[in-house]
Each structure stands twice: as structure tokens, then as C-alpha cells.
Amino acid sequence: MEIEEIGRCYGTMRGEIMGENRKIYAALLGAGTVGSGVYKLAGMQEEDICLKTGAQLEIKKILVRNPGKLREGIPQELFTDSWQEILEDPEIQIVIEVMGGIEPARTYVEEAMKAGKQVVTANKDLLAEYGDPLFEIATENKCDLQFEAAVAGAIPIIRPLRQSLAGSQLTEIMGIVNGTTNYILTKMSEEGMGFRKLWIWLRDWVMRRQIPQRMWKAMMRDARSPLWHPSLLVPE
């Protein structure tokens, strides 16, 4: 262990205290815009993650519908269309679910935790509909179900609420908690657009963009869930 000059935050590195850095394997479920971004970010931040945690994070497998499709910046050998291949791999300790929707995401998350794997999800719909039973499964299997990326545009708010402010009594939470809400309020405040007129404009905008009804409903209800569910704010 080496202590460097005063003021250097990385002078003493956890990895050095723990000995040789261990490798942690993860699997990504989904390789769309979010999934590809997670993979690339994990690579860019590899050294920082190692310095701060003493562990090397490696994406071992990526679950997709079409493994033969070329995706820029991601090695082809990582892709698989077999969930069982990921589930039954003892080296994979973390499953990162970024595929969206309810099914098969719900089944995969449940099975991963029952197999003892830790889960990270950015799936608002899934948590809004099945948050309680999923957290029960996580508790029963002594697994983590991390969901910060699914709340308020990934603003780091859940961990401070559950840990840093665990001894404080929360009486109120105020804020603009998603991009859709922020966009609507900006139209109303800066352009003076009334809500009725705005609603008609939004409806036409959705039709022009051919946004699926399911996605539009999720965008509109995003501000109501899952941040506001009481069980998600109880200190650990």
C-alpha cells in the first residue's frame, strides 16, 4: 500500500489493499441504444472502476434477438440469443437488464436473482408493475436489485435517500423527474402554451413520429413511477 501526497484522492487504492484485482463478469440483456451505451461506457470507465472497487468489470455476454447482426464497437462473439447460456454460466455474477418492456424482462430478472445473480435494471415499466414481488425475490435470495438508472433520468437520488439520509425524516419530495415532463412545462412556461392546446400538439406530434402507443403511455406515466413508491424509499 502506498500513501501519496496530501490531497490526492487516489493515493491509496482499494485494489492495492485487497491484493490482486479480481475480475467480475456481467451480462447485458439488450444491445439497443442503452445497452450499447452501457457496454461502451464500461470499457471507457474500466480503469476508474478498477481503481475505486478493486475489481475488473468485464461484459462476458450480451443477449439479443439476432446475434448475427453487426453492431459497431462490440465484438461479435459476445452476442447470444440464449438466455439459458447466461443463466447457467457460473462466472456471470451480474445481469444488467436494459431491454425494456415487461416480458421477457420480468422472467429474466426473476430467474437471475433466483440463481443468485445480482441485477441492475433501467426498466421503469417493470418496476412500476412488479416492483414489490421483484424486491421480495431479491430479499429471499439475498441479491441486489439496483434500479437507480430507472428513476428521474438516472439522477443519483435513490442511494442518498436510502443510505445517506437514512436517519432523516422525509416530509416532501419536489422536482421535475423526467424529460417528458420537463419538455411539457418548458412549452407552457416559455411559449405560453395552454395545457389543452399543448395536449393537442403532443397528440399530433406522437402521430407524426409514429411513436407506439405503449411507449407514449410509458412516457406520460414516467413521472408517477417508480420513484414515488414508498417501498423504494425505505432505508436499507
Pin down the residues of each PLM region.
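Active-site-lining helix/loop region of Rossmann-like oxidoreductase modules
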Residues: G167-E236
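Short acidic, glycine/serine/threonine-rich loops at helix termini
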Residues: Y39-K40, E72-I74, G131-L134, P156-Q163, ...
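Conserved active-site and cofactor/substrate-binding residues in soluble primary-metabolism enzymes
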Residues: L29, T33, G37, L57, ...
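A short hydrophobic/small-residue beta-strand
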Residues: V119-V120
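Rossmann-fold NAD(P)-binding glycine/threonine-rich loop
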Residues: A105-E111, K124-R162
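N-terminal glycine-/serine-/threonine-rich beta1-alpha1-beta2 phosphate-ribose binding loop
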Residues: E5, G15-K114
